[in-house]
Amino acid sequence: MALSTLNREVIKKNLQNEEYDVVIIGGGITGAGIALDASQRGMKVALVEMQDFAQGTSSRSTKLVHGGLRYLKQAQIKVVAETGKERAIVYENGPHVTTPEWMLLPMHKGGTFGKFTTNLGLTAYDRLAGVKKYERKKMLSKKQTLNKEPLVKKDGLKGGGYYVEYRTDDARLTIEVMKRAEENGAEILNHTKSTDFIYDSKSKVRGIEVQDLLTGEMYEINAKKVINAAGPWVDEVRKKDYTRNNKQLRLTKGVHVVIDQSKFPLRQAVYFDTEKDGRMIFAIPREGKAYVGTTDTFYDNDKTKPLTTQEDRDYLIDAINYMFPDVNVKDEDIESTWAGVRPLILEDGKDPSEISRKDEIWEGKSGLLTIAGGKLTGYRHMALEIVDLLAKRLKQEYKLTFAECKTKHTPISGGDVGGSANFESFVERKVEEGKAIGLQADVAKRLASKYGSNVDKLYNIAQIAQDKDLKLPLELYVELVYSVQNEMVFKPTDFLIRRSGKLYFNINEVKQYKDAVVEELAKLLNYTQSQQNEFTKEINIAIEEATRGNEQLAVLK
């Protein structure tokens, strides 16, 4: 049926009339992964997300599927081993949203990593994470380090480590996982809030009450089991249940800044320590920009809208100018920013960066299953663990049996390209097909690289659109229409922030075409005038918040 906004009413009707094996609360990467795993095993799955997919934490990360080198420093061996192996699986199943990226780790006198510890750490990392032979670490001299990135601070430089991480588009990874779950039969809806639980006569959870936040409509979804995968909202969801353990979340905030490469001509991804507190942060080139982050501070304010403060901006500017002294970045050079919250499990007495990124599953007396903590990279394994438990409970309580987990070798939506080894030749072939229908080679390459095996649908839209009088560039129009028809975009922010990433990496294009995007969506989705006004205001606020230092307190008073 496709994960289409145009199918909202049909999906809503199904959600009201069917009974599901499981209903999942939360449409970030964790919920998406669970929906994929459960549906792949043959379970009847429903999922609701109160905002847009990936709007919480899953669109606001450092955009790396990585093995977590820094966790070696904290002796979190299991985390390194598991996430290192998982990142290879994520890449193989979705090479259109994940790309290997060589990372430079400069070693300076008095820095976090010396030559011995870097060599030892990266060797252990290679072995624990099961790194492919051609991607194993290299140790570089001072000269070799500067050849890789001439902007790195020369004073005290002793050399560098060189190892592979995987760059991703976190929000697109989430939507592609979600689309594959829908292809398996999962019923999925965004902008739909879980408001309460439904219980049977034995006080066991048997579904949820929800509200469509676009229409105000309330209805029930019946299910044998409920999984709470609400990320930062896990505790709020559990509070609606009558049973809960003494565990709770501790949120921390992470901020990234984006600078044009004309000002910060970074040619190489770099992982470096800051002067102020010795924390490790990333500087990564992407699409003509360089983005830098992340901060790590305790946060207890509005979870739906964590903002970048002036203090956050200053911290990252200082970090850039410390490691790249010739750049001399100023506040006005920052084009865009994003802030996100990490839903970590509380560990008393620990600083933000010391709290473990491990995940945990909690089971209430009501039967409610909750998954908390975890990392973007580990989403598939987290899903495997909780769906194994779900299958066990469905067998015990309902005598139902399901297949084992299959997601290790399941391409996500767009990933049917013949594996990572064939992705480059797949893109080349699709570029030729795009040129044959009149697309510019660079446009065809961007579309094929971004959408993988789904690109034919975008080409079909492009062919129809070529004869139209468009207010948008053809490429932008094609992506917009596709996102409505296949990725459940309803609001301009859904598209301009999460499906395209343009608010972060091409904010000038957002400023130029935002009104035309609103107009096009109004036509496609029959906005009321009040909706059109509201959504125009929403994107203008998003632009303002991304481009300035905000005065948001870390703790809500």
Swiss-Prot record:
Its cofactor is FAD. GO terms for molecular function: glycerol-3-phosphate dehydrogenase (quinone) activity. FAD binds at residues 21-49. The keyword Flavoprotein applies. It is an enzyme of class 1 (oxidoreductase). One of its GO terms (biological process) is glycerol catabolic process. Pathway: Polyol metabolism; glycerol degradation via glycerol kinase pathway; glycerone phosphate from sn-glycerol 3-phosphate (aerobic route): step 1/1. It is found in: Cytoplasm. It catalyses: a quinone + sn-glycerol 3-phosphate = dihydroxyacetone phosphate + a quinol. One of its GO terms (cellular component) is cytoplasm. The keyword Oxidoreductase applies. Its EC number is 1.1.5.3. InterPro entries: DAO_C, DAO_C_sf, FAD-dep_OxRdtase, FAD/NAD-bd_sf, G3P_DH_FAD-dep. Keywords: Cytoplasm, FAD, Flavoprotein, Glycerol metabolism, Oxidoreductase. Belongs to the FAD-dependent glycerol-3-phosphate dehydrogenase family. This is Aerobic glycerol-3-phosphate dehydrogenase. The gene is glpD.
